[in-house]
């Protein structure tokens, strides 16, 4: 079956470090039931119009299109591409990652998502909440919605340091939606965290946010604003007792960082939303920051190993193909 995957991926041009779309495409390329079409113009949305031989279009991150460079034009190309594909009899699968745009507070992302819901022949999501959200937000849509767990990036299990250096690690790109600043301010006044060592590491491209975090830092939080290599990141997670996620649950449904963290077999604490709630055997979920120090560090080894075994990237195209009868 011929499939086109948006956004297109060109390893020579894509420097974003987007592991998800790279693995997604490679999984379909490796499965003999699929033929991936991937003509890559400079405007990724124009790619839909250049790959109309595809029988199936799988579309990711529709909510981000309006905020791209020349967003209005990109949105136009995207709409034209979807309509042209449907006129040719292709089926449209929307992979719903977020409830809405994380950073674009205009109405444009929501309008495009509304339109996408009316055109999709099927919706896939990496969280049970995603299916509930889709049915509640788009009740007029007749498209079936299915939950497929987020695949893991590797089957390798990373060893832990003999003596942990950090009690908690917060890692990944730092932006306002991840509520790192809010957590730092909370922690500074929380006696239950005062005897903990907390590492925050990741690149923060927002200079104003970076400055605010530095002003708010208590002595027991170490802040490292830097882009870390895979090896550097793995070393820091391995040297930590627990992985902590402070995300704003308003828009998030699933998290690649959460899935990446599973291979360390560490206790994880995160907000009670989306895939964090789905993985309740692994993730200790909180409703507000005040609950974080009260949550026990549970043994997640068996549950994490089970998830890793059941959710490889190689299995993902097979799971999609099993739903073909509903398209």
Give residue ranges: language-model regions.
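Acidic donor-binding loop of glycosyltransferase active sites
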Residues: 235-252
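Nucleotide-activated donor-binding/catalytic signature segment of Leloir-type glycosyltransferases, i.e.
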Residues: 210-231
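Conserved donor-binding/catalytic core segment of Leloir-type glycosyltransferases
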Residues: 161-178, 184-188, 198-201
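Donor nucleotide-sugar binding/catalytic pocket of nucleotide-sugar-dependent glycosyltransferases
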Residues: 118-136, 140-157
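Glycosyltransferase donor-sugar binding loop
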Residues: 197-210, 226
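Acidic anion/phosphate-binding donor-loop and adjacent secondary structure
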Residues: 105, 135, 146-166, 179, ...
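A charged, aromatic-enriched C-terminal amphipathic alpha-helix characteristic of glycosyltransferases
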Residues: 290-327
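Short hydrophobic beta-strand element within catalytic cores of glycosyltransferases
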Residues: 243-244, 261-272
